[in-house]
Amino acid sequence: MVEGSYACGNSQKPLIGITIGEMLNRIAAAHPDSDALISVHQNIRWTYAEFLERVNTLARALMALDVERGDRVAIWALNYAEWVLVQFATAKIGAIMVNINPAYRTYEFEY
């Protein structure tokens, strides 16, 4: 017997209707001094204001490299704060982050 591969929750609640980037802007404006990201192993603690500034800086840098809406940006990284920056920066410009398994060997990545 084949069963569905997804779960369907309450469909009566409407979608938010804003982008991830806009949601980050709103949260950072409302709670600029609250913790947004903590990476203990990197000794990093960024507030929403700091996080938003870093995300916007990275988004501008990606756009300067001609990354635009719909483009794919691959990241081959371990669990670091910068991974989260890439996720939000690509979302802000409408690009798609492609996560490459950091356990891949070079020859697997080349394939």
Region spans (language model):
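Hydrophobic alpha-helical segments typical of transmembrane helices
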Residues: 19, 23-24, 108
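Structured binding elements
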Residues: 94
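Conserved AMP-binding/adenylate-forming core of the ANL superfamily
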Residues: 16, 33-88, 105-111
